[in-house]
Curated annotation (Swiss-Prot):
Localization (cell): Cytoplasm
Name of protein: NAD-reducing hydrogenase HoxS subunit delta
GO cellular component: cytoplasm
One of the record's GO molecular function terms: hydrogen dehydrogenase activity
Gene3D superfamilies xref list: NADH:ubiquinone oxidoreductase-like, 20kDa subunit
Top EC class, one word: oxidoreductase
Length: 209
């Protein structure tokens, strides 16, 4: 299979989200960034907002493409930087992460779940069938007398036997730890990358005591 050119989009046979031509014209010269949340709580995505007013000058240099903030489902064109929150816990997560890896020059794990699995990975010490039974059959919220079944349908993404950190599925270029990471850490990484500076997160940013 031919490797995609840097300006092409690999999308696992799914069409990229169409982009408004007027919006595309306004993005010329800006660095394209995409974000995605996999198996996590989305707290790391909210940390982007903790950059507060520092976002404004960044947006003069950055165009945010696929993101929970834009509701674009697929990356519409190749991106320079991709931020991934959450671990990998389903076949859909795997496909989404591979799509990001194929279409982002730099891919960054954001937060504990993406870096090492986080809280969702606590289920890794149990068999998947036991986790599903606890959630759907033995749950305290189960309706008495109702038939308890584990849902299965082709349209429901199949759950993986364990939760994986992102780097065990695809190559990740950088890691921003934290649960969630501080907005200062995300800002430093993005600001340094956008301005072509090497970066090294100081330990003070990642200390919580």
């Amino acid at each position: 299979m031919r490797a995609p050119h840097k300006d092409e989009i690999a999308s696992h046979e799914l069409p990229a989200t169409p982009m408004d031509p007027a919006l595309a014209a306004n993005r010329e010269g800006k660095i394209k960034v995409a974000t995605i949340g996999l198996c996590g709580c989305w707290g790391c995505t909210l940390s982007f907002l903790d950059m507060d007013e520092r976002l404004l000058p960044l947006l003069e240099k950055v165009t945010l493409l696929r993101s929970s903030l834009t509701d674009i489902k697929r990356i519409p064109e190749r991106c320079a930087i991709g931020f991934v929150e959450g671990g990998v816990s389903s076949e859909e997560n795997i496909e989404t992460l591979e799509h990001f890896r194929e279409n982002c020059d730099i891919l960054i794990s954001v937060g504990a779940c993406a870096v090492w699995g986080g809280v969702p990975a606590m289920r890794n010490v149990f068999e998947l069938k036991d986790c599903l039974a606890e959630a759907y059959v033995n749950s305290a919220t189960a309706v008495p007398g109702a038939k308890a079944v584990v849902p299965f349908h082709p349209d429901i993404p199949r759950i993986t036997t364990k939760v994986y950190p992102c780097h065990e599925v695809v190559k990740m270029d950088y890691f921003i730890p934290g649960c969630p990471p501080d907005g200062d850490a995300i800002f430093k990484v993005l600001d340094d990358l956008v301005n072509g500076r090497p970066f090294d997160l100081p330990s003070s940013i990642n200390r919580y005591d």
